[in-house]
Amino acid sequence: MRGDRSDRLMKKEIFNLNRHLPSRRKTLEELLREDRPHVTGADGTRHRFKWAELEDLRGMLTEDEARRLRLPIYIEIESETSGARIAGDIEVKVVSEVLERDDEGDEIYIYRPEMRVLRARFPTVTQYMFLVREL
């Protein structure tokens, strides 16, 4: 009984940590057409993207990839692991290039020092997403 209550509280806290995440992500192509590129978080806050980051990102991708890449790129932090996961073939391509690693397909695992490098280059293009596995 006690475990059920603490599990529910943990899930609620994780939900609260993720309230900043957008209810709808936009493609890089869409954002480049906006005067003030942004997405709206589920909590109603606006997350603005810096032009320099969007242009830097655009230079790394083909036209087709710019049409398909949805932003922000999520850095998935899980409760049971020490690193983070980034999913999606285009997202992995970007992260691999920034970190000077081989492209690993459709997901990549990174650790704290690599997160700092990624966030230093793309602070507005990336966002943390907190996950908790079934307890």
UniProtKB/Swiss-Prot annotation:
Protein origin, superkingdom: Archaea
Pfam families noted in UniProt: DUF61 (PF01886)
Coiled-coil ranges per UniProt: none
Family annotation (InterPro entries): UPF0216
Signal peptide start-end: none
Family membership noted in the UniProt record: Belongs to the UPF0216 family.
Protein name: UPF0216 protein MTH_949
Organism ancestry: Archaea, Methanobacteriati, Methanobacteriota, Methanomada group, Methanobacteria
